[in-house]
Each structure stands twice: as structure tokens, then as C-alpha cells.
Amino acid sequence: MTDFSPREIVSELDRFIVGQSDAKRAVSIALRNRWRRLQLEGALREEVLPKNILMIGPTGVGKTEIARRLAKLAGAPFIKVEATKFTEVGYVGRDVEQIIRDLVEVAIAQVREKKRKDVQARAQLAAEERVLDALVGASASPATRDSFRKKLRAGELNDKEIEVETQASSGSPMFEIPGMPGAQIGAVSLGDIFGKMGGRTKTRRLTVADSHEILVNEEADKLLDSDQLTIEAINAVENNGIVFLDEIDKICVRDGRSGGEVSREGVQRDLLPLIEGTTVSTKHGAVKTDHILFIASGAFHIAKPSDLLPELQGRLPIRVELNALSRDDMRRILTEPEVSLIKQYVALLGTEGVTLEFGDDAIDALADVAVQVNSTVENIGARRLQTVMERVLDEISFSAPDRSGETIRIDAEFVQKHVGDLAKNADLSRFIL
């Protein structure tokens, strides 16, 4: 769990996301409050609940990116789900408790990866012994093994093929029984039981280089205590887990509508206990959701936040409105973030030996085209820049292997030549941009 101050968290988010200072402040305070709660003792710690957030703003302005970067920064178990994927219990589809089960799987993978690093040195030695067994046999003399060990460490045997016994994945089918929350669990647990009883392995023919990572991971997993790993993962979910619920506006029930709305309202009702705090059964054990942070987001083009069930509105106390992107924002998105679009394209074409140079007038022209198309067709925010950039650089990307060593300067004239006419023609833009 990170102990960054809210100011440091905002500063970190500024490296990747342009603008939206209100949203950044809200999530930075929410993250800092997780750390503050963990400093409390006893009963008070249990009583302090997270203040869940509702982000309201058009598509492509940074809602998902803020949540994703926040989770990365926190090193917390994080899952992004679309609210529209879920149905009310009793309907065909996934029930909302599956969100927590998936979050536990994410946490287990995270903890396992971290613990593997702790036993990396021992695992590498054990993997090396298995490779030597495959190369010279288990009964080879110490002198022979030492000779081959030196060659192995020098990389001289990387291309040599060996046969190794590796763990076979259980491959057990997973069944979802509609209307039965957690029905999937039984099938998975059964598969695990039979997998462990059989201890199945399979022989694979691999090069020494390819076998290295597989064998190191297997040996590391043997050194890990799986029960302790699961306990740590569940603890991480319960105290630091973050769930990002996208498209929450699509499950709003609007006045005077019926039919499919029934299931939508049911999804909202199913979400209530999850956000308020309940215990969810997973195949790894029970998980309490009281201290999981929920960040819901939606464009709310048609529905309004007040169309959500009043109880659900009450469980999302912090409201943040994200602004639509201006021309200046578009320009900044192209150049300011550490991994801006222009830097990405320069690096990609640099691998072919092509040097791309963007003039200031080209950046202005790209921003103008994106804003123009967003205003005439459909406003998809910063995502429009990707479409425009692809169109502008289409010819260069295609012919790059034949143009190695060239320096290509992109200016406003170049941009207008490739997308200017399309941007002016709304009918063409609708299909091409």
C-alpha cells in the first residue's frame, strides 16, 4: 500500500493524464484515506468505511485512465468491469458477486508474482538442476555436471533442445449455472481436487532458453506456501481492493420505460449490498467487501445520476464531474504525457530507422481536426486523436520498411493533405474518422 500524500498522487497522475484536476483530487484523497485507516487501531479501523466515488463525464476524457493509473500507483488489486455485463440473479448472465471473485484471482496473481521474486534465486538454482538432469542425466558425475553448468550459464546451450516434465494445467471445464451465485465454484474446486490427486505432468520438448522461465516459475511455486499466499491475497482485496464500475449510467431505469428495465433495476439492487458491505463466497474463502473502494463512472448522456436508485446514490457519496476536452487539452494530450501519442509513433517508426519530426503547426492541425470531427459527428474525446493520427501516418507506416534512414517532417500542410477533406465532409467523417 502506497503512503504517497494526495499532492504526490495528483502529481503522479499528471504525468499521464491531462486536466481533470477535480477527479484527480477526489481519487487521491480516497487513496490516502485507505492508508490513514490502516494507521488506526482496533474497532475504529473497522468502522471507517471508504467514500465511494461517482465520476460523471463524456467518453474519452480520462475516467478509466485515472482509475487504472491509481490502482497501478497503489499496487492494489484492481478490476475494471462494465455494469452492462451483469444481470439480476435469476436471469441468464453473470451475477455481480463474480466481480469480487475475479478481484480475488487478480490479487492472488499479484501476490504470487511478488512472492516469486523473493524466492527467485533459489528457484533459478533448482531450475538449473532440472535442465542439467535433462542434458546429462541425473546420474552424471559432478565433474560433467559442472562442465555443463558453466556452458549453461555462459549461454552456449540456449539453442539445444531438451525434454522436461512440466505441470499439466488442470483444464477443468467451468460451468455457470444461471441464478445460482457461486455455482461456478463447485466445478472449479472439483477440478482442483482431481488435479492435485493426480499430480499430472506432461513431457515437453523445448529449447534450453524457452524452458528457463517455465521451470523457474514452477520451482518458485513449489517454494511458496499456497495457503499463506491466499490469506495475503484476500487480505489485500479486503483492505486495498479497488473496483471500477464503468457504464453505470447504462443500468439506470428511466421514467416511463419498461421491459428490459426490470433486469437493470435488479442489477442496481444486487450492487447495493456489495458496495455497502457484504460477505462473498469464493473458492478461496469468504471475502468481506466493507472496505473495498468502488469507483463508478458513466457518461450520463441520456440518463441522469438521479435516475439511479436512491439507495445506490447514497452509497456513492463523492460526485466528480469531468470536463469535455477543449482544443488546448487535445494539443496537450498529444505532447505532454510521458507516453503521449506522438512519442509512441516516433518510437514505433524509429524501430524501422525512420525519424519522425512533428512541427508545432502539425500538432495544432491535429488538435483542430480532432475537435472538428468530435463536434460534427460524435464526441468520443481523446480517442479521436488516435483515429486522426492513424489516418495521417497511414502511408508512412505502410512504407516505413523501405524508407529506413529517412527523416520525415510532419507539418500542418501534411496533416491537411491526409485528413483535411475528410474532416470537412461530415458524411465521410462518420465512416472514416
UniProtKB/Swiss-Prot annotation:
Native organism: Rhodopseudomonas palustris (strain BisA53)
A single cellular component GO annotation: HslUV protease complex
Annotated residues for binding of ATP: V18, G60, V61, G62, K63, T64, E65, D246, E311, R383
InterPro entries from the UniProt entry: AAA+_ATPase, ATP-dep_Clp_protease_ClpX, ATPase_AAA_core, Clp_ATPase_C, HslU, P-loop_NTPase
Transmembrane spans: none
Tree of life domain: Bacteria
Role this protein plays: ATPase subunit of a proteasome-like degradation complex; this subunit has chaperone activity. The binding of ATP and its subsequent hydrolysis by HslU are essential for unfolding of protein substrates subsequently hydrolyzed by HslV. HslU recognizes the N-terminal part of its protein substrates and unfolds these before they are guided to HslV for hydrolysis.
Protein's recorded name: ATP-dependent protease ATPase subunit HslU
Primary site of residence: cytoplasm
Assembly notes: A double ring-shaped homohexamer of HslV is capped on each side by a ring-shaped HslU homohexamer. The assembly of the HslU/HslV complex is dependent on binding of ATP.
